[in-house]
Amino acid sequence: MAEDDPYLGRPEQMFHLDPSLTHTIFNPEVFQPQMALPTDGPYLQILEQPKQRGFRFRYVCEGPSHGGLPGASSEKNKKSYPQVKICNYVGPAKVIVQLVTNGKNIHLHAHSLVGKHCEDGICTVTAGPKDMVVGFANLGILHVTKKKVFETLEARMTEACIRGYNPGLLVHPDLAYLQAEGGGDRQLGDREKELIRQAALQQTKEMDLSVVRLMFTAFLPDSTGSFTRRLEPVVSDAIYDSKAPNASNLKIVRMDRTAGCVTGGEEIYLLCDKVQKDDIQIRFYEEEENGGVWEGFGDFSPTDVHRQFAIVFKTPKYKDINITKPASVFVQLRRKSDLETSEPKPFLYYPEIKDKEEVQRKRQKLMPNFSDSFGGGSGAGAGGGGMFGSGGGGGGTGSTGPGYSFPHYGFPTYGGITFHPGTTKSNAGMKHGTMDTESKKDPEGCDKSDDKNTVNLFGKVIETTEQDQEPSEATVGNGEVTLTYATGTKEESAGVQDNLFLEKAMQLAKRHANALFDYAVTGDVKMLLAVQRHLTAVQDENGDSVLHLAIIHLHSQLVRDLLEVTSGLISDDIINMRNDLYQTPLHLAVITKQEDVVEDLLRAGADLSLLDRLGNSVLHLAAKEGHDKVLSILLKHKKAALLLDHPNGDGLNAIHLAMMSNSLPCLLLLVAAGADVNAQEQKSGRTALHLAVEHDNISLAGCLLLEGDAHVDSTTYDGTTPLHIAAGRGSTRLAALLKAAGADPLVENFEPLYDLDDSWENAGEDEGVVPGTTPLDMATSWQVFDILNGKPYEPEFTSDDLLAQGDMKQLAEDVKLQLYKLLEIPDPDKNWATLAQKLGLGILNNAFRLSPAPSKTLMDNYEVSGGTVRELVEALRQMGYTEAIEVIQAASSPVKTTSQAHSLPLSPASTRQQIDELRDSDSVCDSGVETSFRKLSFTESLTSGASLLTLNKMPHDYGQEGPLEGKI
């Protein structure tokens, strides 16, 4: 610390002293406290530095200090204290200790030294005549109150001048002649008193009360015995008040997460020892193999620091977001003022999970082959394809599709199904056929079985013996199969169950055969699906039904067919079935952006109110991903209104997610649908306007204020308004916007402006009443401070410069008239309202509609705001309006031949490049409000008729009166 002090190393910067006096006043080399000094004469050296941190400065009302200022090497069981030594000298001496500042230039400090040998804030100790080491075991530091700094400092300077204690160094260079002690009751003249007063006034403004240094000065006796021979003073390392927020040791106490995604932006709660909210950073760093260091900083504002002990921040993006394995880094607190850091803690960046909904994973599963439908395996009997995908002969085992399971039944092979007759003692068979049953002709038919069982209509097995019951016959009707079983013993009941399966299998085989015939005739795949519609409720290993999988694989026509064949009794169960991630088919349709499938599912009765595993409804998912087309379809449903203000598992409404995704179209849809723009998210009470300010998105903030009538002074749970956040983050544009919308810069939040424990100077003056923090208190720059005090916002460029960029005047009036007519057509894709959105003036559409000629008003406003023909052509190109483009090209072709400077490059790349020059790289200029910051204030766009720029708003319940002026 001391060796880096600019004062100790650059004497020419101290008070601009006369070079002839520099050597006599002091030599900077003697200020190296731990270094042997290159001189043959006496000099002063620091043997033990004071401990820099952990010692508390005490106020008068707190009483004396408990223990003296410890030394740097002091330990619990081995105390040490600051020590100095007078080298190259043996004899009597006097050493004085003064408190000085820690700034670039050393001055007297207003705090006082107290303890043994201390008087008037100065410690005086005698040394020698043999032991020239002087220790200071009982030094305390008395903290002066802010109100008494000037008074104390002036008295301290006067005393230093009277006694000759370094007045030229510590007070003013013009007082350097008052050096030697022995002046006694030296009287100071008016000029000297005025110099002292001016120095005290100046230093009072600059003094840091949380840090001091010790300045040791030794005096040796002269020939008369008076201590007038001054040795060069030495200055200790800085001593920080342990009660000062910017002086305490930085320490991370707890974090709720120690890992995050490489993309950053994940919220972490960090508990720490006391910090100063405007003087702290959260630093992530990694030491690279080549010796370099990567670092990133957590994103938070002063409003995210709670009572100096907790910080809520968002993680920074890692240097490489394409890593395939986790990367270990460190996180630490760092103070801005002195770059002091805490002990680092490990943090893990893991690769980005791009498929959180597992849609891509399921799409990448092995697709079934056509040959798989014929079954496989081996067996002793005849093979063949089967309805259940099994094959082989008798005794062979079949293969079902992956993820599905069907029971293996032991029956003889029939129609491709493997049956095994040896599972029971009976060799019961089955009769089938038409009215002329073949079983009567077959001597080996099933009616010749010895043991018989009868199955009644209720599925119960009735046991009889051959003596009790006559052999039964199998009767077969047209299209029916009736089984009659011979009775047997109780042990043969398993065979009856096998026979039941055989009966059902035969019925199923006939149904599938008929469906196949119908499909061959009609070519309609629904004929095949209809006989299997009950199987649509089957789920695979991920819980997905066939409807889920059809949506995942983007088979929209198959989804329609499935919805049609399952309509009826079981449709509700299937259409709202959830997989293992609690996703319904409607959730997946929204995630995969299939607008037509969303419409089909809603028509079929899909339930909008069902939530996924994270509590997200389909409105949340659409807003989160910025799918405005899907969101528009969902909002038309009658149940959508009930979900507009429903929070998800993170306490966020759909409008909050639209803000976080920076989607202006989604925000406009939600506002138009009636979403509550003042709704608070449930974690900290932020509204959509708070989130817009946090994301520094002036377009969304302007939309909320102008279109949504958002409450400009809405508060979070701790009383923070959007203006608090804008001021704390230093955003001049948003501060100007909010101030123009009527935000109050004097609103206090619940965060105390200062800590009572650190403000003993207020004792006795309304003790316990601490004001909150206002946006003015949080202003991080003078520009923001001036805006909050009513000074007009001044952009970095001038209006004249922007006017020079506009070239709309080159279009003749007849050309403009043709454009007006083309833009007045009712086609919503080609009218003036769509063009306004493309030109970044969509926020003013409601105002344009008030004009008798909206298209003319739009073009006039665009021209006055510095618009260019290039931007206009590009906007029309995006609309696909070739007729309007041809009108402009035809009018501009003569100009092109005469002046290359006014040519119209119609290349999209070049046009976009010109547009981007007027836009910030980190935001989208499409709300109109943002355009007003980059171009001329649009108050000049209309000079007659209804004003388009003073947007009259509905009366507010929260006290905002009058119109919201467009000029900021």
Curated annotation (Swiss-Prot):
Domain RHD stretches: 42-367
Lipidation sites (S-(15-deoxy-Delta12,14-prostaglandin J2-9-yl)cysteine): 61
Sequence motif: Nuclear localization signal, positions: 360-365
Residues modified as (3S)-3-hydroxyasparagine: 678
Xref: SMART domains: ANK, DEATH, IPT
In-chain residues carrying the UniProt-annotated modification Phosphothreonine: 943
Origin superkingdom: Eukaryota
Region named Disordered: 425-453
Region (GRR): 372-394
Domain remark in the UniProt entry: The C-terminus of p105 might be involved in cytoplasmic retention, inhibition of DNA-binding, and transcription activation. Glycine-rich region (GRR) is a critical element in the generation of p50 (Nuclear factor NF-kappa-B p50 subunit) by acting as a proteasomal 'stop signal', which leads to limited proteasomal degradation of the C-terminus, while generating p50.
The protein, known as: Nuclear factor NF-kappa-B p105 subunit
Taxonomic lineage from the root: Eukaryota, Metazoa, Chordata, Craniata, Vertebrata
